[in-house]
Amino acid sequence: MVKNVTVIGGGLAGSEAAWQLAKRGIEVELYEMRPKKTTPAHETANFAELVCTNSMRSNQLSNAVGLLKEEMRQLDSLIMKAADETAVPAGGALAVDRDKFSSVVTQTLKDLPNVHVHEEEITKIPKDGITIIATGPLTSDTLAEQIKDFCGTDSLHFFDAAAPIVAASSIDRDIVYKKSRYDKGEAAYLNCPMTKEEFFNFYKNLVSAETATLHGFEDKNVFEGCMPIEVMAKRGEKTMLFGPLKPVGLEDPKTGKTPYAVVQLRQDNAASTMYNIVGFQTHLKYGEQKRVFSMIPGLENAKFVRYGKMHRNTYIASPEVLNANYEARKQAGLFFAGQMTGVEGYVESAGSGLIAGINAARETVGEETLVFPKSTALGSMAHYITTTSAKHFQPMNASYALLPKLDYKVRNKQERHLEISKRALKDLETFKEEKKLD
């Protein structure tokens, strides 16, 4: 019996899948086309490079992605190990030093004797053996065409964007102040307060700023969770005040009052030499980013280490293509994982790779593949992307809306979410014992 599996793609999902396979004694042939062939969004040759934000969002069990993280920790996730090991201060969220994070993942996999890394592009879907395709939303054109033909449907797409990063040394510390919203967790964010006059001056310049040309870009194709700040601003002059510029819970210690608007800066590396502008994904031209974002109090003389940018993301019509074990319906032994399946977010992508890796390993040794319980965050994501309406299919983050309701009432929303999380972790533990998952 063949005891090796091919994993195509060394992103979050592919890296997690390779880890889950390798720890079960499977020989892994891991293909990653970088650095020989790169993408519009990647900057390094490392596995699991974070191309958008450095935040993995909430770390709280009263939040769906916090639950997802804990489930993955219970299943010995490499991505969660690396994230916890390279975490930087972020209040109640989990943010990482992006370079250290990807380096830990890369080195861990390369050190495993049964993971064989191939730096080359795969242009055809293997017809034999067991394969996991986790090439991400920036799959090379040649393979993307193969996947499109295999799926028998037009590939779907949306546009994703990354926020700018500024040098810590260029931030005016006399203006900004350190605080987390509602003083939750440690004071992890630098806050740039705006008066009403400063906000509306910034708003007018932002909505009139020139954007870079991107073929096929339309507002309707922007994923809501990573919307460019200029697109958000154009939806209404006060829209940003309910989004990334929300001032609630961020009183200025100098005045004791809540500013009209607040722009937050989050630490981007462990050395605290870089900060990203939270929620400021953008597709403005670089010169316009410098001009407009330097209007933010405290960033008048900011040095931009990286400007924001936008790229096209592609995903497959999973409801028509996949089973809830992430295996293709029309080819046994072929699995898909990551953002290309329609799960949206770093942690969600890694979670799909975790399931695909476990199932590919089980199929390799002749065991039944697993469908995780719908009452878990992992299972609810797999269930959603494979059973929802294909016609209206859109990328989806982890959400309590995907999980079954409690069979008893809990009025307080946070307490209700905690109860759902407790049930999920209990069900996962039972599932692990029944299926002998280590």
UniProtKB/Swiss-Prot annotation:
Keywords: Cytoplasm, FAD, Flavoprotein, Methyltransferase, NAD, NADP, Transferase, tRNA processing. It is found in: Cytoplasm. SUPFAM superfamilies: FAD/NAD(P)-binding domain (SSF51905). Its cofactor is FAD. FAD binds at residues 9-14. Its EC number is 2.1.1.74. GO terms for cellular component: cytosol. One of its GO terms (molecular function) is flavin adenine dinucleotide binding. It is an enzyme of class 2 (transferase). GO terms for biological process: tRNA methylation; tRNA wobble uridine modification. It catalyses: uridine(54) in tRNA + (6R)-5,10-methylene-5,6,7,8-tetrahydrofolate + NADH + H(+) = 5-methyluridine(54) in tRNA + (6S)-5,6,7,8-tetrahydrofolate + NAD(+); uridine(54) in tRNA + (6R)-5,10-methylene-5,6,7,8-tetrahydrofolate + NADPH + H(+) = 5-methyluridine(54) in tRNA + (6S)-5,6,7,8-tetrahydrofolate + NADP(+). Coiled coil: none annotated. It comes from the Bacteria. InterPro entries: FAD/NAD-bd_sf, MnmG-rel, MnmG-rel_CS, MnmG_N, TrmFO. PANTHER family: GLUCOSE INHIBITED DIVISION PROTEIN A, METHYLENETETRAHYDROFOLATE--TRNA-(URACIL-5-)-METHYLTRANSFERASE TRMFO. Catalyzes the folate-dependent formation of 5-methyl-uridine at position 54 (M-5-U54) in all tRNAs. Belongs to the MnmG family. TrmFO subfamily. NCBIfam families: gid_trmFO (TIGR00137), PRK05335.1 (NF003739). This is Methylenetetrahydrofolate--tRNA-(uracil-5-)-methyltransferase TrmFO. It comes from Lactobacillus gasseri (strain ATCC 33323 / DSM 20243 / BCRC 14619 / CIP 102991 / JCM 1131 / KCTC 3163 / NCIMB 11718 / NCTC 13722 / AM63). The gene is trmFO.
